Swiss-Prot record:
Record's comment describing the protein's domains: Consists of 3 domains; the N-terminus binds the ribosome, the middle domain has PPIase activity, while the C-terminus has intrinsic chaperone activity on its own.
Pfam families: Trigger_C, Trigger_N
A GO biological-process term: chaperone-mediated protein folding
Keyword Isomerase appears in the UniProt entry: yes
Superkingdom in the source lineage: Bacteria
EC numbers for this chain: 5.2.1.8
Keyword annotations of the record: Cell cycle, Cell division, Chaperone, Cytoplasm, Isomerase, Rotamase
Function in brief: Involved in protein export. Acts as a chaperone by maintaining the newly synthesized protein in an open conformation. Functions as a peptidyl-prolyl cis-trans isomerase.
Enzyme class: isomerase
Similarity annotation: Belongs to the FKBP-type PPIase family. Tig subfamily.
Catalysis performed (reactions): [protein]-peptidylproline (omega=180) = [protein]-peptidylproline (omega=0)
The protein, known as: Trigger factor
């Protein structure tokens, strides 16, 4: 096998490969032998059919598999010889495999750009001191009390208000006919949490226990369920009860019930420690980003288009998920797909620059990520998302996501390695 390399750009290579006749014949013979082993034909014993008949019967399959085998073998050889790590799909361009002639084809792919890293040893960076405001701890304790509150009927016969829980029946109608999917009995509704349509909640807030009412139910044009988007219905409501939360005292008994703490002081200590841990991680991450932004301004390099496109896709997926959590859709933005791609592209380019810089730093620092670490990361993702580990790992493998996960882990390790070499000065937090 012979090959020549063309640099189509600083981030794209093309390799022209020529496979000699001898290798072509060997690949075809191997493919024929595989098919011949299990082939049966009248007049011949199984596995004894002449090669020319096997080739004639399964020509398309044999030549296809021989081509694939040759390409796979030579791609691995070329990548090893060039010490190349493609970051894009490898595009194949070649003719048909034929007996008696060399097999010539080309492959093209994108690679990381080559550039000199700036000197980050002793790089000056300021990191804010991690502090915890006791008001934040008090807010956590209040949330715990709220979650453990007892719901008791209000003393007076009044409509519900923000913070109350209303028990009600409701049903929606269109032209006097019930609308399937919009009705419930003894439904518990938290007022003030903005989870219901404004029309619905406003109506409920006018009704005391035992009262009934009806009013318009207007769905926004960007409502996530297209069956109701932009529709105007009528909703009928009957309130059974209005309840208020009776918060338990912030005492040792609450601490024991909430988390098995021996006292309220111990629970406050645990909350404070948790806050301090997350705040320490936050101020470090903020300082690391500031340092990285400064280092990125000291270098310039071209960006592989495939990598930018990948991050554009990720950002659009994130946008779609956020909108869906708000009960909206991408269409609600009123923009064409190409407009949305153009909007997120600058951010995608910045993410790409950051990732490339850190991958180069990882190579310089000798940072590696092994298979056990990747498996551990997938296990963490599975636990956080409530998914099955094996199913999630299969998904990552089938969708070629393992390598991008590995690169993210490499980038994180590289950032830590760079930061360890920085001259970090702790400063007081900025006034809020």
């Amino acid at each position: 096998m012979e090959y020549t390399v063309e640099d189509l750009s600083p981030v794209k290579k093309k390799v022209n490969i020529s496979v000699p006749v001898e290798e072509v014949e060997a690949a075809l013979s191997a493919a024929i032998a595989m098919y011949r082993t299990n082939m049966s034909l009248d007049g011949f014993r199984k596995g004894k059919v002449p090669s020319n008949l096997v080739e004639s019967r399964f020509r398309k399959e044999i030549y296809g598999e021989a081509t694939q085998d040759l390409v796979n073998v030579h791609i691995n050889e070329v990548m090893t010889a060039l010490d190349a790590n493609p970051i894009s799909r490898i595009d194949f361009d070649g003719g048909q495999l034929e007996r008696g002639t060399p097999f010539e084809y080309s492959i093209s792919f994108e690679v990381l750009p080559e550039f000199d890293l700036p000197d980050y040893d002793g790089f000056a960076v300021e990191q804010e001191k991690a502090v915890v405001d006791m008001k934040e701890v008090d807010e956590v304790i209040t949330r715990i009390r709220t979650n453990m509150a007892e719901l008791v009927p209000v003393a007076e016969a009044r409509p519900g208000k923000d913070g109350d829980v209303v028990v009600l029946d409701f049903a929606a109608f269109e032209n006097g006919e019930p609308v399937e999917g919009i009705s419930a009995e003894n439904f518990q509704m938290n007022l003030g949490d903005r989870q219901a349509l404004e029309d619905f909640e406003n109506l409920v807030k006018t009704l005391a226990p035992g009262q009934e009412g009806e009013g318009p139910l207007n769905f926004p044009a960007d409502f996530i369920n297209p069956d109701f988007a932009g529709k105007s219905l009528t909703v009928k409501v009957k309130v059974h009860a209005v309840k208020e939360r009776r918060l338990p005292e912030a005492n040792d008994e609450l601490a024991q019930k909430a988390g098995g703490f021996e006292s309220m002081d111990k629970m406050r200590e645990a909350v404070t420690s948790s806050y301090m841990q997350s705040r320490t991680q936050l101020v470090k991450a903020t300082a690391q980003k500031t340092m990285l932004d400064k280092l990125l301004k000291m270098v310039d390099f071209p960006l592989p288009e495939s990598m930018v496109d990948m991050y554009v896709g990720h950002l659009l997926d994130d946008m779609r998920s956020k909108l869906e959590r708000q009960g909206k859709s991408m269409e609600s933005l009123g923009k064409k797909p190409e407009e949305l791609r153009a909007e997120v592209r600058p951010e995608a380019e910045q993410v790409t620059r950051t990732q490339i810089f850190l991958l180069r730093a990882a190579r310089k620092e000798g940072v590696e990520v092994n298979e056990q670490e990747i498996d551990g990361q997938i296990q963490q993702i599975a636990m956080r998302s409530g998914q099955d580990y094996n199913a999630l790992k299969d998904y990552y493998i089938k969708n070629n996501l393992i390598f991008s996960l590995r690169d993210r882990m490499l980038a994180d390790k590289a950032m830590d390695a760079i930061y360890e070499k920085a001259a970090v000065t702790e400063v007081e937090p900025a006034a809020k």
